[in-house]
Amino acid sequence: EIMIKLFGEGIKDLKYYWFREYELDGIPLIISRTGWSSEFGYEIFLRDGTRGNDLYERIMAAGKEHGLKPGHTSSIRRIEGAMLSYHADADLDTNPFELGLDRLVNLNNEVNFIGKEALKKIKHEGIKRKQVGLELDCEPLKGPNTTFWSIYKGEERIGKVTSAVYSPRLKKNIALAMVKINHSEIGNSLKINIDNKEINSKIIEKPFYDPKKKIASS
C-alpha cells in the first residue's frame, strides 16, 4: 500500500526479482521486487546521492498511517529467513561453499573471474567450517547479539554465533553460526558462551521460516 501510494498501481506489475527505473518528485530511482527481510518487499536504489534525505522523508511520510518504522540488519525476519548480513554472517574470510551458496558458483564456465582459482582450490580441498542454524535453549533473548558468541563442543572452541534473535513467531531463540565442519551435522548438541553463561543449543535446518520464500515471491 505504501509503494502504491508513492508510485501508483503500476508498481504491482513488477515481478519477483525484476527491476524498473522510476522517478519520485524528480528523484531518480531504480526499484526492484526484492528485499532483505524474506517478506513481500521492494528495494529502492537512489541514483542521486544528494537526494537521500528527500527520499527518506517522502517514504516515511507515505508510510506514517501504516506504522512504517526504520529497521536494521538484526531484524527478526532477516534471521528467520537466514539472510546473510555482511560483517556478521559473511566477510572477506568466508566463501560460498561455507555459506551454502555454491549453487551460485559455476567453476566450469570458460569465463575467468576474480577468485576463480581460489574457489577451485577450496572446492578440491573441501571446507573446514560451515554455516549452520541453531536453536538456543534459554530464556527469550532480550535483543539481537551485538558481539560474536563462542561455541564449544566439550572443551574445544569450534565456532561462533554470528546472528541471534528471539522469534515470537516460532517461540524460540534462533541463530546463524559458523562451526567446524566435523561438528556441523543437523541435531548436533553444542554449548554457547553468552556473557560467561553456558547455554545449550542444537543444530537445526535453516531457513527457520518459509524456506521456499513463498511469502517473498508471492
Describe each region flagged by the PLM.
Residues E1-S218:
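Conserved, structured C-terminal
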